[in-house]
Amino acid sequence: MIQMQTTLDVADNTGARAVMCIKVLGGSKRRYAGIGDIIKVSVKDAAPRGRVKKGEIYNAVVVRTAKGVRRKDGSLIRFGGNAAVLLNAKLEPIGTRIFGPVTRELRTEKFMKIVSLAPEVL
């Protein structure tokens, strides 16, 4: 569960290391975001020669949460931390590589590019 002020790791090669959620998109009173939801983030820590700079604002999709996701069969998939992939204005991934596993819940038309780049889909 991601809410405002939550810090997330970045699971791509854009150069950002840590981002902070500044808004959960999708409704005026929406408080929490889960896996597959789009959030607005601010870059808090970035590599010196990366594509993104500290302080820049981007859209991001949540790919891993410590809270996890419940499947229809009752199983629960949790992760050790929260992670996101940065997106451009057209909601396409900025990076060309994805690090770490992603869940099957991302297999929608919007995020097939992320699923195809990921090394493992759970």
Curated annotation (Swiss-Prot):
Record carries keyword Transit peptide: no
Pfam family, one: Ribosomal_L14
SUPFAM superfamilies hit by this protein: Ribosomal protein L14
Gene Ontology BP terms: translation
Disulphide linkage map: none
InterPro entries: Ribosomal_uL14 (IPR000218), Ribosomal_uL14_bac-type (IPR005745), Ribosomal_uL14_CS (IPR019972), Ribosomal_uL14_sf (IPR036853)
Gene Ontology, cellular component aspect: cytosolic large ribosomal subunit
Record carries keyword RNA-binding: yes
Taxonomy, superkingdom: Bacteria
Record Gene3D superfamilies: Ribosomal protein L14
Molecular function GO labels: large ribosomal subunit rRNA binding; structural constituent of ribosome
UniProt KW keywords: Ribonucleoprotein, Ribosomal protein, RNA-binding, rRNA-binding
Role played: Binds to 23S rRNA. Forms part of two intersubunit bridges in the 70S ribosome.
Subunit composition and interactions: Part of the 50S ribosomal subunit. Forms a cluster with proteins L3 and L19. In the 70S ribosome, L14 and L19 interact and together make contacts with the 16S rRNA in bridges B5 and B8.
Record-stated family: Belongs to the universal ribosomal protein uL14 family.
NCBIfam families linked to this entry: rplN_bact
Name of the protein: Large ribosomal subunit protein uL14
UniProt source species: Bordetella avium (strain 197N)
Gene that encodes the chain: rplN
